[in-house]
Amino acid sequence: MAYDSKHTELLEPKEGYNLTEKEYKKYWTHLNSFYSLSFHRFVPRERENYRILDLGAGDGRMYPQLKGLEPEEYVACDCAEKLLAQHPGRIKKVVCDLEKDRPFEDQSFNLLSAFFLLEHIEDLDHFFAESYRVLSDRGQILIGHFLQKRLFMRNVQAKRFKIVQYPHTIEEIEKAAQEA
């Protein structure tokens, strides 16, 4: 834990997002344009035995769009167990640190989604290496990323904080994805 300005704590994603579990949805407004997307045009038409791993799934903000792909299995994965507990639906929920190896078998998913996640990943090389490991041969990674100049301030339970972020450029993300 560190301070990046007077009386503002800088928290790791797990701690910060667990604190925001009940108020997280009010922070969604700047992301609303993503919620009207249809992912059908990005994935194969034939999706037999289709398995989706939603990385950084949080409270399920992207679940309606991913559920619309009618996967055989959808798995939500996040480091913040309290936020993940808010995720709707009767689905498999896995708490894991995406900076480490993932608790999934090799080539076990057809689609990995990572929306608004990469800014919380320090080691992109490891992130993509692990993503490719659990991805099937013809699998895809669907990434939603936005660039922001400053961290969002959060005030929860009389605690003022920001969540650690790493300002990766699109070029850095592309390079890490290609070299993994």
For each feature predicted by the language model, list its residue ranges:
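Short conserved loop adjoining the S-adenosyl-L-methionine
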Residues: 101-106
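Short alpha-helix
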Residues: 165-180
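A conserved beta-strand element that flanks and buttresses the S-adenosyl-L-methionine
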Residues: 113
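Short catalytic micro-motifs in class I SAM-dependent methyltransferases
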Residues: 116-117
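Class I SAM-dependent methyltransferase SAM/SAH-binding core
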Residues: 59-100
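Conserved class I S-adenosyl-L-methionine
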Residues: 1-47, 61-65, 83, 142-167
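A short glycine-rich, Lys/Arg-flanked "PGG" loop and its adjoining helix->strand segment in the class I
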Residues: 125-137
